[in-house]
Amino acid sequence: MGEWVIGAFINIFGSVAINFGTNLLKLGHNERERLALQDGGGKMPLKPIIHNQTWRVGILVFLLGNCLNFISFGYAAQSLLAALGSIQFVSNIAFAYVVLNKMVTVKVLVATAFIVLGNVFLVAFGNHQSPVFTPEQLAEKYSNVTFLVYCGILILIVAVHHFLYRKGEVLISTPGQEISSYWKMLLPFSYAVVSGAIGSCSVLFAKSLSNLLRLAMSSSYQLHSWFTYSMLLLFLSTAGFWMTRLNEGLSLYDAILIVPMFQIAWTFFSICTGCIYFQEFQVFDALRTTMFILGMMCVFIGISLLAPDDTRGNETKDNSSSLDSIVSSSVPTEEDRLIPQSSEDGHSKDTRVVVQGMYMKAADLIAKTKTACLAALGFGEDSINASAILVMPMVSSKITGFRGNGLERAKILSMRGSGWSKLAMEEEGTRMLEKTISSKA
């Protein structure tokens, strides 16, 4: 049995464990909310989720799955494992049905069939080699002309889509400007492409680290080297970027659009990066290339079919729009808050308010960054079904939807529309600020 088979099985078990863990995390949050309703009628504050036994088991299974996926990259090709990670969608359906008692529709079954069929093609015709590289060989591959050209193209793609995204933001923020359906589709697409292109590099660095770990176990190679630490730093940076963009993107856009875009972009760039860097395409002939591409198309079709219902997305969007208007009308703008109470000490009060506002803004950004990093591990007040860094996170499906609540989305949209000049503060922060102004008046 080839080593690629071992890597494939480890990856499958890891993906299944990740999905089982995330469903247990979701179940733990549901149990906590149900107990809060039973004990205090929903008025009592929720206990920390870490006290829930189901959640603790879920986080252990989740971490075990991530470790298995990390190990698997040392035994099989990146292009194979990146595509094979889509098997988690199949296991998620089964676990959501058994653990969360969710309904499985015909559309979900059809999507599952496409994903399974695509994975059969990918496994049968993918790269079956699993060589172990030395640090010198890995470093040499980073200076390969083909890989450098690919990196240049990748940077160009990221720059173009980032420019388009910023241009679209300017058009949206312009008062009275009509936004065409073209820009409404291009904005989330550009956001997903930038996120997937950079975030998928975490798979490359993870495979390099896994390769070094495997080399250290089979020889006298010492992990204590500049190359190992460089790979670790790059992995943490790209993985952190991916998780942050993933969390933010799901709060900004309807899941029916952004979910399949995220998943397809991440998988596509992960496969391309592995094929170019490790030169995995060299073993492909015309037949294997055709069947591998066909398998990828089947997987992408299946992922697209797993997007949430349009009706559900519209309902959420309508609710978000109404909440956005509520938040916008209830939270005073910066200009309203910074009106001086008197002409004598207006300047000093204005300065104090601005300084306090800047401080609260910085604290809010730090809190959001911390939340984004911990969200994928299930920590925090809200359950988030992000599954892994090394495989495409199971962020949303018809079974276990992953969307920020409407109030969070409204706050973010309000902040994005107002810009830096208008400080977007939470309600508690606003009350504290107004109280400070009145006490010093």
Curated annotation (Swiss-Prot):
Keywords: Cell membrane, Endosome, Ion transport, Magnesium, Membrane, Transmembrane, Transmembrane helix, Transport. Residues 1-4, 78-79, 127-144, 206-222, 277-288 are extracellular. Disulfide bonds: none annotated. Signal peptide: none annotated. Its main location: membrane. The keyword Transcription regulation does not apply. GO terms for biological process: magnesium ion transport. InterPro entries: Mg_trans_NIPA. Residues 26-56, 101-105, 166-184, 244-255, 310-441 are cytoplasmic. The keyword Cytoplasm does not apply. GO terms for cellular component: early endosome; plasma membrane. Residues 334-347 have a biased composition (Basic and acidic residues). It is a multi-pass membrane protein. Residues 313-347 are annotated as: Disordered. GO terms for molecular function: magnesium ion transmembrane transporter activity. Residues 320-330 have a biased composition (Low complexity). It is found in: Cell membrane; Early endosome. The chain crosses the membrane at residues 5-25, 57-77, 80-100, 106-126, 145-165, 185-205, 223-243, 256-276, 289-309. Belongs to the NIPA (TC 2.A.7) family. Acts as a Mg(2+) transporter. Can also transport other divalent cations such as Fe(2+), Sr(2+), Ba(2+), Mn(2+) and Co(2+) but to a much less extent than Mg(2+). Homodimer. This is Probable magnesium transporter NIPA8. It comes from Arabidopsis thaliana (Mouse-ear cress).
